[in-house]
């Protein structure tokens, strides 16, 4: 028998009425739910046991059959099948609707699918469906022709009759000798009357001719026409009419008609025909029928999915769906009754409209008109509301499940723990591991059965704790700190049982979790299965997660006290006890320190292991003892940055276990010496520099001059403002320099800031110098500086100005965190199916990585190429020696060699150019930065990329808070810029760019400012003459197109005429150059573009400049869509990567280019079809680039005409919604729209991404290579590194 879960794709499509009836176990005919006295479901009601199954396991409604032995029997008395009660979660019912009803998803969507198919506007459709207008459903052409003929006969008959009547009257008048005037008047009246009669008949004929299927008629028009021409046409209203029209559609004919229309029309009409064609193709390819968008049978959800529960006061709480179903059933029953008794048409029509509205409310309440409310103001939750939004079924229950075997507690620091350990409170561990402890108690014979084992555990006997110790030995636990921004926010640890109620966390993993000990809480999860335990131990243990996946930097680097302790340990103190003493080796120096003869930081001389005399300190000797032998003696002050570099270097030469031991030793050293340093901070440590008074007075003077010039009208408001800001910024910098110059290098404040433990020079300047300029809530700098320092105290006015900045910091924190989280969610969605699925895609393409022109704006070339694979040989520019072969990894040594060779650009493999049709290949991605090796197969690199970009987004957001609102770059400018780029939106301040290469001319006149770009491209056309041909033109001669340039030379004196088609003729007009047998015509083509420049924009070019296409003409940011249309795909990819990188790098956040490239690849993965050729593709359709190439290749192989298309740059939201997986798209945004489209197209989800597998409860298709499998590779690397030169010989970026 096939397993229920054994499937590899899910299809969604429209349900036919027959299919709905086949799902159903019976028709629900009554609106009742349960009997309020017996509390039993009413028969044929919404909770009927006969339809949906018994309420109690294996017990029918009347109680005749009880127990499992009657399973499957249907009670002859109450009609209930004997089964488990859980069938009430699966069994559906149905309602037979008295008249067809439109499904609101298909009638009211944008665009309305029914409207598009029938060529009706949404407004017209609404008029029909809600019974306000009639629509013609059929026209009898024969009857129409006959009616027209009859009308013409009647018309001529009437005219003839009237004519003879007039003739008789005229004859009579002539006999009575009437005046000529009177007779003429009668004739004139007849002429007018005849014209009126003909006009009336023509009007009726025109009305008949205008009757077309699908035309709308008002009620008056309908009755008027029906009275006269009842046999010519049929018209009706409501969903019934739409059902008829939809069932008449012949999809093949419609397709041919629309294809013709897309080829023969243009503009809006072509666009609409393209959309209609896509819809027709969708119905043709899927097995759906268009009439299924109109419902004649309504499915009823199983009752346990819309439960009704009794509350304490005898009242009932019920799902809103029951109320919505009740309304539908009531109206349906009433309509059936009215139709049976033959009620007037108007009453029936009104009841049909009410039924349509009831079904609309059930499916999607509030989409049309006023939403139905239950219990006063509470809006009823419809079926669509159950799916959409954060509380909907997708995001609340399918993607965010609750987890058992988990706990939560406050965290405290555990300085004595090993790196791979965490402290788990005994009581918590006992609850978490209860089943394991109970099993062990029974197995070891300490309890006879599980029940008594549970009692032992609940009484917490001493033997229970002994067994608990054994259980936790081989079971790691997962710790998670919310918000889970990247994969390092969940790590595995070996639990150590402790007393108390708080979790203990190793201090070195705090930065990975972004945790501190001010009341943070963390969750604990227990991996249950063997596979889960194996994965936790081999890939999730904290010792396997020491590097940041975003940049490859160490994440387990010491901080705060530990940094200060190591810095204090390695600094020198001039004049300290024992200074200048000489020792034979390190051990002797340490013994003297332990005996108290020399000071820890005294400068001494010692012979190292190689016999060289070193000038160092005992502290540095102690510090170097914990480092591996392969690392050269570190004879310098060790601040935070140096520790990071040392850890990065050691990671490459030590195993995970040795690395963990070394880190624990550094941690212990740091804590020990931070304690013995006796560091403290007092008011006396902060001294205001003497130069401050003079500098502030000079700045006041310059400010007064600027104010005076402004008062006299010599400068503008902007110039005054800029002058004041510049003055105070300069002054602030000078005061900062003065503070630095006057620092006590042995002082606590200086050491704290210099070591990188806490604080920076900006904060010290605010304490000792002056607070400086502040920003107001809008981000504008206030031109009134705070001249006091925090040491001196602020005046009342200064205090209130400073609160501006502080408040802005707090407000930004609250507002921007959500923005960053939403950006992360969109990034995750767009990349969730990017997984490493191929070893090598074999592409020869790549991307150029170029040394940035502006240092500090982008990372240096050496950092950007590290860990990438080359797409071309990297050759030394001077010697020609190959530094890196094609298709080889650039490691640290090769990267250093490239830097030293002065190479400024390298062609590397990139995710942007990877040709894997699904996911990505290992070579194009390169090194996994978190593991420092080539990325493993099945790694979810898309998720890693999204986390790497999103996690620092939140960090940047929160960073405003820590600077206390002092003037500086605020993420308010950074995060929206990143969002703008990833959403491919036009920038707020959009720069004008040139569409062509050419020479600039800036024009300024009364009509404003214009820039004209003129391009004169010189081309040449060459003609090679066979020998013996004679030229008919001279060099430098101007020739016109079509002029003869050369002809065959005739032999002898023959008079034969040369045929004109034998001559060489000029294809273009231009100037001739003749060189031997080669004639060249030089000609130029000129092109001009003119751009109007808005007054507020600053021009970046000047007259006479030569510029390239895509170059900026004005200030601002370039619209990525413009770059795509002018310079193409590669240029826009490069622009996106560099612009995003600039935002992060300027904030001091390091993200590897490849993460941004993964996102950019997803933004450009679709193409829009321009012409379909001989393929089944539809013009205007969005198709995956690789699928498009595949289809074209097949068509070309068969000798057909391929389709044409252009690349589309989509924002991450649009890209997520147009993903191949409808499950992933529906769980992201616009759930109902995605499901509507997917159902019509009959989409198949192949379950290739992560989200769709999580939704249906399968394992995700991403398994990393376990660390055990990687140990052999690592051992080889460590052996190679051990024989490598010592630390000083390695490049800076590998430290």
From Swiss-Prot:
EC number in record: 2.7.7.6
SMART domains for this protein: RPOLA_N
Keywords: DNA-directed RNA polymerase, Magnesium, Metal-binding, Nucleotidyltransferase, Transcription, Transferase, Zinc
Keyword Mitochondrion: no
Keyword Iron-sulfur: no
Pfam family, one: RNA_pol_Rpb1_4
Binding, Mg(2+): 516, 518, 520
Designated name of the protein: DNA-directed RNA polymerase subunit beta'
GO BP terms in the entry: DNA-templated transcription
Catalytic activity: RNA(n) + a ribonucleoside 5'-triphosphate = RNA(n+1) + diphosphate
Binding locations of Zn(2+) 2: 841, 914, 921, 924
Cofactor note text: Binds 1 Mg(2+) ion per subunit.
Family: Belongs to the RNA polymerase beta' chain family.
Purpose of the protein: DNA-dependent RNA polymerase catalyzes the transcription of DNA into RNA using the four ribonucleoside triphosphates as substrates.
Gene3D superfamilies reported in the protein's UniProt record: 1.10.132.30, 1.10.150.390, 1.10.1790.20, 1.10.40.90, 2.40.40.20, 2.40.50.100, RNA polymerase II, clamp domain (4.10.860.120), RNA polymerase Rpb1, domain 3 (1.10.274.100)
InterPro entries the record matches: DNA-dir_RpoC_beta_prime, DNA-dir_RpoC_beta_prime_bact, RNA_pol_asu, RNA_pol_N, RNA_pol_Rpb1_1, RNA_pol_Rpb1_3, RNA_pol_Rpb1_3_sf, RNA_pol_Rpb1_4
Chain sites annotated for binding Zn(2+) 1: 60, 62, 75, 78
Database matches in NCBIfam families: rpoC_TIGR
Cofactor(s) named in the record: Mg(2+); Zn(2+)
Lineage start: Bacteria, Bacillati, Chloroflexota, Dehalococcoidia, Dehalococcoidales
GO cellular component terms listed in the entry, alphabetical order: DNA-directed RNA polymerase complex
Assembly behavior: The RNAP catalytic core consists of 2 alpha, 1 beta, 1 beta' and 1 omega subunit. When a sigma factor is associated with the core the holoenzyme is formed, which can initiate transcription.
MF terms (GO), sorted A to Z: DNA binding; DNA-directed RNA polymerase activity; magnesium ion binding; zinc ion binding
Enzymatic class: transferase
């Amino acid at each position: 028998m096939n397993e229920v879960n054994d499937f590899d794709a899910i299809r969604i499509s429209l349900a036919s009425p027959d299919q709905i009836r086949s799902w159903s176990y019976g028709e629900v005919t009554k609106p009742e739910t349960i009997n309020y006295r017996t509390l039993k479901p009413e028969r044929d009601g919404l909770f009927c046991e006969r339809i949906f199954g018994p309420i109690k396991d294996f017990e029918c409604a009347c109680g005749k059959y009880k127990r499992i032995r009657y399973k499957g029997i249907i009670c002859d008395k109450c009609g209930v099948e004997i089964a488990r009660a859980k069938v009430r979660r699966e069994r559906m019912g149905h309602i037979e609707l008295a008249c067809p009803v439109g499904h609101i998803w298909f009638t009211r969507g944008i665009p309305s699918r029914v409207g598009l198919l029938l060529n009706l506007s949404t407004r017209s459709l609404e008029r029909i469906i809600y019974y306000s207008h009639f629509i013609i459903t059929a026209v009898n052409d024969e009857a129409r022709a006959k009616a027209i003929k009859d009308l013409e006969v009647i018309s001529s008959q009437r005219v003839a009759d009237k004519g003879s009547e007039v003739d008789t009257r005229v004859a009579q008048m002539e006999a009575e000798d009437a005046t000529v005037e009177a007779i003429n008047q009668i004739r004139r009246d007849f002429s007018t009357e005849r014209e009126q009669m003909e006009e009336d008949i023509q009007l009726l004929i025109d009305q008949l001719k205008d009757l077309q299927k699908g035309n709308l008629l008002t009620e008056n028009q309908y009755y008027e026409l029906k009275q006269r021409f009842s046999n010519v046409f049929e018209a009706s209203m409501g969903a019934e009419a739409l059902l008829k029209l939809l069932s008449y559609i012949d999809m093949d004919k419609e397709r041919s008609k629309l294809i013709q229309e897309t080829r023969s029309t243009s503009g809006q009409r072509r666009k609409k025909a393209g959309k209609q064609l896509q819809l027709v193709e969708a119905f043709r390819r899927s097995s759906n029928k268009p009439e299924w968008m109109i419902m004649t049978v309504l499915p009823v959800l199983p009752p346990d999915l819309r439960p009704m529960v009794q509350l304490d006061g005898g009242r009932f709480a019920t799902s809103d769906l029951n109320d919505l179903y009740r309304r539908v059933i009531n109206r349906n029953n009433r309509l059936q009754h009215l139709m049976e008794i033959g009620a007037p048409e108007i009453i029936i029509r009104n009841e049909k409209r009410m039924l349509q509205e009831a079904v609309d409310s059930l499916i999607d309440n509030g989409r049309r008109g006023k939403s139905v409310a239950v219990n006063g103001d509470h809006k009823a939750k419809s079926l669509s509301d159950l799916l959409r939004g954060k509380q909907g079924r997708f995001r609340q229950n399918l993607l965010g499940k609750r987890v058992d075997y988990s706990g939560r507690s406050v965290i405290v620091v555990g300085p004595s723990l090993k790196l791979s350990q965490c402290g788990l409170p005994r009581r918590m561990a006992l609850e978490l591991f209860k089943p394991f402890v109970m099993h062990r108690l029974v197995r070891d014979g300490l309890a006879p059965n599980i029940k008594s084992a549970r009692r032992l555990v609940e009484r917490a006997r001493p033997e229970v704790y002994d067994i608990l110790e054994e259980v936790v030995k081989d079971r790691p636990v997962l710790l998670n700190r919310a918000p889970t921004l990247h994969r390092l926010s969940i790590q595995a640890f070996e639990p150590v049982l402790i007393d108390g109620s708080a979790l203990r966390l190793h201090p070195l993993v705090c930065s990975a979790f972004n945790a501190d000990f001010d009341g943070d809480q963390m969750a604990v999860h227990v991996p249950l299965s063997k596979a889960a335990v194996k994965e936790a131990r081999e890939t999730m243990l904290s010792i396997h997660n020491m590097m940041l996946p975003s940049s490859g930097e160490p994440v387990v680097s010491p901080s705060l006290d530990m940094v200060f302790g190591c810095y204090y340990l390695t600094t020198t103190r001039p004049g300290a006890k024992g200074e200048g003493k000489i020792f034979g080796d390190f051990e002797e120096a340490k013994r003297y320190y332990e005996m108290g003869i020399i000071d820890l930081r005294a400068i001494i001389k010692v012979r190292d292991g190689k016999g060289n005399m070193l000038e160092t300190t005992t502290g540095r000797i102690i510090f170097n003892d914990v480092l591996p032998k392969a690392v050269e003696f570190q004879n310098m002050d060790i601040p935070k940055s140096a520790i990071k570099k040392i850890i990065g270097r050691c990671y490459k030469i030590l195993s995970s276990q040795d690395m963990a031991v070394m880190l624990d030793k550094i941690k212990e050293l740091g804590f020990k010496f931070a304690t013995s340093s006796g560091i403290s901070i007092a008011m006396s440590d902060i001294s205001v520099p003497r130069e401050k008074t003079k500098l502030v007075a000079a700045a006041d003077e310059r400010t007064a001059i600027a104010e005076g010039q402004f008062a006299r009208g010599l400068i503008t408001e902007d110039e005054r403002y800029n002058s004041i800001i510049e003055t105070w910024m300069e002054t602030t910098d000078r005061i900062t320099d003065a503070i630095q110059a006057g620092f006590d290098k042995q002082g606590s404040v200086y050491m704290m800031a210099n070591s990188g433990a806490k604080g920076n020079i900006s904060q010290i300047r605010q304490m000792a110098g002056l607070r400086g300029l502040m920003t107001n809530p809008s981000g504008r700098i206030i031109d009134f500086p705070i001249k006091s320092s925090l040491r001196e105290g602020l005046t009342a006015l200064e205090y209130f100005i400073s609160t501006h900045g502080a408040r802005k910091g707090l407000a930004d924190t609250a507002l921007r965190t959500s923005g960053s989280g939403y950006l992360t969610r969109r990034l995750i969605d767009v990349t969730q199916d990017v997984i490493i699925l191929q070893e090598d895609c074999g592409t020869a393409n790549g991307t150029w990585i170029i040394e940035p022109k502006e240092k500090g704006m982008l990372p240096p070339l050496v950092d950007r190429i590290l860990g990438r694979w080359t797409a071309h040989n990297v050759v030394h520019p001077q010697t020609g020696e190959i530094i890196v072969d094609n298709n080889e990894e650039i490691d640290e040594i090769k990267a250093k060699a490239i830097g030293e060779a002065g190479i400024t650009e390298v062609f590397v493999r990139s995710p942007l150019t990877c040709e894997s049709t699904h996911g990505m290949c290992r070579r194009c991605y390169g090194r996994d930065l978190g593991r420092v090796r080539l990325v493993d197969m099945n790694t979810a690199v898309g998720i890693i990329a999204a986390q790497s970009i999103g996690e620092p987004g939140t960090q940047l957001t929160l960073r405003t808070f820590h600077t206390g609102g002092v003037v500086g770059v605020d993420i308010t400018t950074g995060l929206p810029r990143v969002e703008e780029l990833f959403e491919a939106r036009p920038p707020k301040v959009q720069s004008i760019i040139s569409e062509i290469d050419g020479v600039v001319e800036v024009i300024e006149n009364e009509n404003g400012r214009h820039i004209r770009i003129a391009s004169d491209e010189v081309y040449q056309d060459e003609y090679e003459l066979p020998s013996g041909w004679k030229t008919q033109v001279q060099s430098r001669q101007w020739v016109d197109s079509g002029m003869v340039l050369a002809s065959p030379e005739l032999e002898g004196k023959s008079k034969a005429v040369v045929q004109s088609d034998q001559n060489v003729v000029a294809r273009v007009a231009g100037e001739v150059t003749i060189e031997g047998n080669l004639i060249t015509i030089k000609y130029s083509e000129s092109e001009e573009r003119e751009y109007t420049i808005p007054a507020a924009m600053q021009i970046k070019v000047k007259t006479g400049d030569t510029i390239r296409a895509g170059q900026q003409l004005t200030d601002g940011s370039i619209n990525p869509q413009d770059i795509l249309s002018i310079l193409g795909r590669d240029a826009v990819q490069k622009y996106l990567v560099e612009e995003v990188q600039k935002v992060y790098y300027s904030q001091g956040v390091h993200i590897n280019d490849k993460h941004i490239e993964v996102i950019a690849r997803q933004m450009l993965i679709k193409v829009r079809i321009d012409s379909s050729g001989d393929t089944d593709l539809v013009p205007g359709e969005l198709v995956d680039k690789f699928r498009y190439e595949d289809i074209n290749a097949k068509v070309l192989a068969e000798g057909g005409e391929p389709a044409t298309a252009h690349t589309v740059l989509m924002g991450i939201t649009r890209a997520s919604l147009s993903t191949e997986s409808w499950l992933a798209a529906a769980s992201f945004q616009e759930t109902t729209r995605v499901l509507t489209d997917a159902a019509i197209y009959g989409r198949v989800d192949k379950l290739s991404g992560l989200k769709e597998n999580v939704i249906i409860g399968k394992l995700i298709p991403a398994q990393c290579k376990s660390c055990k499998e990687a140990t052999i590779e690592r051992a080889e690397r460590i052996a190679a590194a051990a024989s490598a030169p010592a630390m000083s010989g390695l490049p800076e970026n590998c430290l």
